[in-house]
Amino acid sequence: MEELQEYLKIEKSWQQDFLYPLFFQEYIYTLAHDHGLNRSILYESAENLGYDNKSSSLIVKRFIDRMYQQNHFIISSNSNSSNQKKFLGHNKNLDLKIISEGFAVIVEIPFSLRLVSSLEGKELVKSCNLRSIHSIFSFLEDKFSHLNYVSDILIPHPIHPEILVQAFRVWVQDVPSLHLLRFFLYEYRNWNSLITPKKSIYTFSKENQRFFLFLYNFYVYKYESMFVFLRKQSSHLRSTSFGALLERTHFYGKREHLVVLFRNDFQSTLCLVKDPFIHYVRYQAKSFLAARGTPLMMNKWKYYLVNFWQSYFYFWSQPGRIHINQLSNYSLDFLGYLSSVRLTFSVVRSQMLENSFLIDIAIKKFDTIVPIIPLLGSLAKAKFCNALGHPISKPVRTASSDFDIIDRFGRICKNLFHYHSGSSKKKSLYRIKYILRLSCARTLARKHKSTVRAFLKRLGSELFEEFFTEEEEVLSLIFPRASSPLRRLYRERVWYLDIIRISDLVNHD
């Protein structure tokens, strides 16, 4: 426990004891609402409510007082639905929205100062390529062929609001700020929806995503920092005797808390060793743990995580929900790709004097393909096709100009091809292009009250040029005529290092 406390210890210089007065500074709300510093939400609200622009601190004080006074409408047992509706509908929650926007900026200050302090005197190589989603797959391409097992992990949710408040006490010791945070967390009962990857975020979280994203990132930070601590400590634990003794050695005492390390009980059987074959990858709330080892070792990691969630976050999870799969027989559904490690066999002829030998060589190869069925489901949900994959028109687009319709459909097609350029089998992507192209033609024909055949005959190749991908445009200039080398080149996987977000059509989890 002492080692864990040292690991999480924060210096006093990083703790901000006086954040609450910043709530009464008008420039905080200017930064929160308008990054261009043209007009702040506080000025706009003051005009609507009849306040003077110069009295920003008084406005915020009245907002905070009114929030605490009106809170009894919700927590009182005698309140009726009309009172709740009155409070929740009060000027679209303007008071709470303004304060929470400023709160999102203020609570980031301790973390920013900590980051600046940790980077002092260090020269870091800035690389924007590491921000790309495709950089994850290039990492997996190098590492996965050497691993044996993978386990899908969903970050547990929901977490109790009081756990977040207690975690904030390590960073912020300003009591009024902690009370205000507790008020926000209990006021917005839908805040847990942000932790769920695909559940909708309700009105407030859409208006002030910065506040909720900060809470979620802080929650993930606490989860992953403890996970890294367990990873570092496990690298120090190994038996110097036989493998059977290793399996009988309990790495951590789980009777009370997972993080209590009984190093003195088996100090003679431990030595310092580093295991580089455990990898952890996360995007949003979905992550996975891959390792090279035995199923028993992966099972230990699984129970470590389950006990950690129970002891630290008070989240009760079932170990059976965390599945351990062998990479050779499993496809990992992650970031819109089905990733797997498959064996490719090749025959090598070896000649020794007068004798020749045929040697079969098995090579592990990282393979990525596009899951066509979920992608078709996303297109059907977006009304580009029906449930069977047949293209349909989009009536909502008929009010736009022909150029805007063609440009929008073309950009969607190019973005999908651009994101899935790392697929080793692009044949399924041509079906997606066919659906989008014919859906565009049906939309234009519906707008002009014509048939698709007549409309395609009138436009000719102009419609199809908008659906050319970047690779097709470049390769068509290099190779004017279709050739076998061109087709082989286009089938190769390409990872782009400029993709920093995932499309809603791709994110079908």
UniProtKB/Swiss-Prot annotation:
GO biological process, one term: RNA splicing
Keywords in alphabetical order: Chloroplast, mRNA processing, Plastid, RNA-binding, tRNA processing
Cited InterPro entries: Domain_X, Maturase_MatK, Maturase_MatK_N
GO cellular component terms attached to this protein's record: chloroplast
Superkingdom as given in the UniProt entry: Eukaryota
Pfam families linked to this entry: Intron_maturas2 (PF01348), MatK_N (PF01824)
Cellular localization per UniProt: Plastid, Chloroplast
Entry GO MF terms: RNA binding
Family to which this protein belongs: Belongs to the intron maturase 2 family. MatK subfamily.
Protein purpose: Usually encoded in the trnK tRNA gene intron. Probably assists in splicing its own and other chloroplast group II introns.
Protein's recorded name: Maturase K
Organism: Banksia cuneata
Lineage: Eukaryota, Viridiplantae, Streptophyta, Embryophyta, Tracheophyta
Gene name of the record: matK
